[in-house]
């Protein structure tokens, strides 16, 4: 037990979290040097006299490597995004609020709630005591960064940062270009294996093995997150669904325009919790990658700038880009549960 607690303290230390990204950069530098000098220059340029192929491969690999580092830097600089401070919702009717006197009354900074919001079994929205703010849908408080992250995905030890709504697209681009460059390394060396027999430096075979390992790790990672985006899921949501030990009940409070009441709907572990899937793969992808197809492949700080909206007493102005929209199909499913009287409680508006 003491050993596990000591290990936890070490792995959570900021310097330890920098160690793996630092080692990753060193391996990348070694791989680029071994490929460009030991393979391209010594094997292709000097031994095979393939000057065009040598220069072309060096330019492509160096360009992709610098692009990967640029994306990495953007992920660190931008961060995962921070949910704006959301004041308490006004869920109790004014007629039920009692004040002792006008002199002792506390100024009311509460705002009208949205039509749907995550809550507890009594209909109260989730409060983050660290950020002194309500936590909206898909938002989780991260101890790594010290604030609530909208559309929290996971903490990546390899790049050393938390992934959320703001830098998730960059992470997908990072894994895509990393897969691309290691594929180029593998294919280029594999096609020359027979000709290099007995003449190649050990560094060439080392970088080939390194590229194979990188592809085995980054390839499935990229495809997994493409799958998640196609169905509008995050890593933490998939873990909660698949891991029964971490599964928990979900509660949403929804306004029913038919009778003017708010209803608290419960979703148990194992029950359908596909809240955000819009039913169309392209629509789901656009929610993560944006509407501009070209920006899916071109990383830019401009396309990742987050807007919190204007300061206002209106929830949608406050939440800005962090607002998560539940699918129409699931909204209808919740209304159907209300009609079947499958709700926890009802609130007067």
From Swiss-Prot:
Transmembrane segments: 19-39, 57-77, 170-190, 204-224
Protein's UniProt keywords contain Cell inner membrane: no
GO biological process, one term: protein targeting to membrane
Location in the cell: Membrane
Protein name as it appears in the record: Palmitoyltransferase PFA5
Domain notes: The DHHC domain is required for palmitoyltransferase activity.
CC terms in the record's Gene Ontology section: endoplasmic reticulum; Golgi apparatus; membrane
InterPro entries: Palmitoyltrfase_DHHC, PFA4/ZDH16/20/ERF2-like
Family (UniProt): Belongs to the DHHC palmitoyltransferase family. PFA5 subfamily.
Membrane topology: Multi-pass membrane protein
Listed EC numbers: 2.3.1.225
Organism listed in the record: Kluyveromyces lactis (strain ATCC 8585 / CBS 2359 / DSM 70799 / NBRC 1267 / NRRL Y-1140 / WM37)
Reactions mediated catalytically: L-cysteinyl-[protein] + hexadecanoyl-CoA = S-hexadecanoyl-L-cysteinyl-[protein] + CoA
Annotated active site: 156
Residues in DHHC domain copies: 126-176
This protein's UniProt keywords: Acyltransferase, Lipoprotein, Membrane, Palmitate, Transferase, Transmembrane, Transmembrane helix
MF-aspect GO terms: protein-cysteine S-palmitoyltransferase activity
Taxonomy, superkingdom: Eukaryota
PANTHER family, A to Z: PALMITOYLTRANSFERASE ZDHHC6, ZINC FINGER DHHC DOMAIN CONTAINING PROTEIN
């Amino acid at each position: 037990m003491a050993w596990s607690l000591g290990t936890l303290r070490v792995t959570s230390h900021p310097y330890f979290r920098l160690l793996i990204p630092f080692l990753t950069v060193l391996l990348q530098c070694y791989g680029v040097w071994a490929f460009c000098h030991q393979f391209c220059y010594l094997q292709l340029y000097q031994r095979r006299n393939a000057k065009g192929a040598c220069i072309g491969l060096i330019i492509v690999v160096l360009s992709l490597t610098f692009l990967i580092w640029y994306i990495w830097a953007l992920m660190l600089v931008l961060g995962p995004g921070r949910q704006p401070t959301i004041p308490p919702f006004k869920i109790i009717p004014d007629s039920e609020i009692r004040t002792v006197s006008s002199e002792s009354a506390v100024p009311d900074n509460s705002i009208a709630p949205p039509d749907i919001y995550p809550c507890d079994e009594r209909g109260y929205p989730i409060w983050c005591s660290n950020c002194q703010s309500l936590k909206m849908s898909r938002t989780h408080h991260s101890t790594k960064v010290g604030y609530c992250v909208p559309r929290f995905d996971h903490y990546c030890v390899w790049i050393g940062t938390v992934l959320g709504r703001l830098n998730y697209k960059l992470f997908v681009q990072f894994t895509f270009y990393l897969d691309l460059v290691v594929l180029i390394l593998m294919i280029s060396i594999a096609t020359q294996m027979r000709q290099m027999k007995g003449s190649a430096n050990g560094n060439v075979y080392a970088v080939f093995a390194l590229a194979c390992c990188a592809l085995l790790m980054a390839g499935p990672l990229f495809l997994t997150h493409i799958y998640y985006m196609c169905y509008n899921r995050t890593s933490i949501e998939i873990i909660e669904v698949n891991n029964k030990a971490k599964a928990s009940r979900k509660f949403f409070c929804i306004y029913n325009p038919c009778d003017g009441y708010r209803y608290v709907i419960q979703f148990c572990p194992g029950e359908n919790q596909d809240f955000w899937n819009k039913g169309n793969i392209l629509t789901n992808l656009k929610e993560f990658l944006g509407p501009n197809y070209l920006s899916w492949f071109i990383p830019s700080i401009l396309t990742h700038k987050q807007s919190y909206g204007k300061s206002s007493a209106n929830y949608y102005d406050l939440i800005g880009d962090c607002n998560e929209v539940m699918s129409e199909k699931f909204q209808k499913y919740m209304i159907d549960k209300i009609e079947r009287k499958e709700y926890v409680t009802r609130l007067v508006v």
